[in-house]
Amino acid sequence: MDKTRTFLDVKEYPDTEVQKNRVLTLEEWQEKWVSRRIGFHQEQGHKLLKKHLDTFLKGENGLRVFFPLCGKAVEMKWFADRGHSVVGVEISELGIREFFAEQNLSYTEEPIVEIPGGKIFKSSSGNISLYCCSLFDLPRANIGKFDRIWDRGALVAINPGDRERYADIMLSLTRKGFHYLLAVLCYDPTKHAGPPFYVPEAEIKKLFGSICNIHCLEKVDVFEEQHKSWGIDYIIEKLYLFTEK
């Protein structure tokens, strides 16, 4: 597909009916880590986050930054190295342990008292805390509120039927003056079942528009050879910034 046409004429599907009943269990996500099917992990970090980092941080220091469905995202180390406090949640203990190992960070682990079976992993420096549990159980742990949320690979991974519940949790974690950066993918959902799931702008506005000003910072063509196996011929990533109304 001609790239110019992709950007100008790409179809926004009005809803996600075709994917709405798609469900992945937590066990299936854990199995992806075990079997190394983690194509969503970006070893060099996210290019658009790097590009718009100043817009996101606004030159502020000592921020609390939340990473939903964090995996072993290298960006967590970026923020910690800049003096910010990072909190993430991830269902895969393997993913969390790999993060600390690959970033050469020592850590402690202890049970999450409020969540049976859950664990919290903390860097020895104290500025990275990763909760190993379901995101939907996280509110029971009372993790406080955040100045920034970096949502890449989270909203697009949540089962479509859980999005409203997810958005409610995310918004409940925001402090006054928050900045929420969201990356989503645009493709033809009739050709690929997901995940990652297709999240149209109308859905984003429905989920977050009552509380947030929503601004699309950038759209980029991210189509690669691997995407042909999905049955699609284009995929566009969109970066949104949410701020307090």
Curated annotation (Swiss-Prot):
Its main location: cytoplasm. PROSITE patterns: SAM_MT_TPMT. One of its GO terms (cellular component) is cytoplasm. The modification N6-acetyllysine is found at residue 58. GO terms for biological process: methylation; xenobiotic metabolic process. One of its GO terms (molecular function) is S-adenosyl-L-methionine binding. S-adenosyl-L-methionine binds at residues 29-40, 69, 90, 152. InterPro entries: SAM-dependent_MTases_sf, Thiopurine_S-MeTrfase, TPMT. It is an enzyme of class 2 (transferase). It catalyses: S-adenosyl-L-methionine + a thiopurine = S-adenosyl-L-homocysteine + a thiopurine S-methylether. Substrate binds at residue 40. It is found in: Cytoplasm. Its EC number is 2.1.1.67. Belongs to the class I-like SAM-binding methyltransferase superfamily. TPMT family. PANTHER family: THIOPURINE S-METHYLTRANSFERASE (PTHR10259:SF11). Monomer. This is Thiopurine S-methyltransferase. It comes from Canis lupus familiaris. The gene is TPMT.
